[in-house]
């Protein structure tokens, strides 16, 4: 869903339109969101974890009233507006917009909500470093790994092997999906897109697949890899933030990964899901 940075990287690697990719991602993104919301609702209804706590929070919110809640949250809601506004107006790049968002959030927390104090900033920075240091290490090693693969011409060999052994369109797309899922588990999104897009795109175009459709399929694949053990980066983020063991989170995430896979199959074999807004 816009402003999806991997779509921008895919556009850079293939020359496709960023705006068309953003449009193509809306319906698949909403479909995936709906599936995950359905599972979360079903899980909470069935297992009832923290039901009393959730109900108490809901009663508290209802007592406040919608407009009071909106008034309290308006400054926080402006943060994504500022980020998207900076990106789409050309005022800042996505990275620069993220920095602007950090300073805006810090200003709001210090002077409007007053939820933190100046003396707490250093501790917050230390906690942020503890959270993201393992992630940066993973990204660094995955970038080096992708460089080694490029030098060994592994992507070209994989492409040649796929073209040689699979001529059926359905089987070919399934194999490409499997390759992308495996890559997404061990490699960061950006190098994966930059390395594999120019190699796999001619293959899927050969069987009549739209490049925009393939871009959506690829990004969804890599998104699944981000939450798939053993190297799913988002698992490390969740583990660091919640102090819950990573494998425990991974176990709970497996049903959601299953819904992701269902969405991936629908996106792969029903092009209209991605292309209906173009």
Task: Show where each model-derived region lies.
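Alpha-helical transmembrane segments of multi-pass membrane transport proteins
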Residues: 1-278
């Amino acid at each position: 869903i816009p402003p999806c940075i991997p779509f921008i990287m895919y556009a850079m690697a293939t020359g496709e339109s960023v705006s068309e990719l953003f449009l193509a991602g809306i319906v698949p993104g909403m479909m995936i969101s709906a599936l995950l919301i359905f599972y979360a609702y079903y899980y909470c209804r069935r297992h009832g974890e923290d039901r009393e706590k959730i109900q108490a929070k809901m009663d508290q919110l209802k007592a406040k009233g919608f407009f009071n809640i909106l008034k309290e949250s308006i400054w926080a809601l402006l943060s994504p507006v500022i980020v998207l506004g900076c990106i789409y107006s050309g005022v800042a790049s996505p990275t620069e917009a993220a920095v602007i968002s950090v300073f805006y959030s810090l200003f709001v927390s210090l002077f409007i909500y007053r939820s933190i104090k100046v003396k707490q900033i250093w501790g917050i920075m230390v906690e942020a470093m503890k959270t993201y240091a393992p992630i940066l290490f993973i990204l660094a090693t995955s970038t080096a790994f992708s460089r080694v693969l490029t030098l060994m011409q592994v992507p070209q060999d994989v492409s040649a092997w796929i073209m040689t052994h699979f001529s059926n369109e359905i089987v070919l797309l399934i194999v490409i999906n499997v390759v992308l899922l495996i890559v997404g588990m061990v490699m960061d999104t950006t190098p994966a897109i930059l390395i594999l897009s120019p190699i796999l795109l001619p293959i899927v175009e050969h069987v009549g697949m739209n490049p925009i459709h393939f871009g959506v399929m690829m990004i969804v694949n890599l998104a699944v890899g981000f939450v798939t053990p053993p190297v799913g980066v988002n698992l490390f983020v969740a583990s660091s933030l919640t102090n819950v063991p990573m494998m425990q989170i991974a176990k709970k995430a497996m049903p959601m990964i299953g819904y992701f896979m269902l969405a991936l199959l629908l996106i792969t074999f029903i092009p209209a899901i991605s292309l209906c807004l173009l």
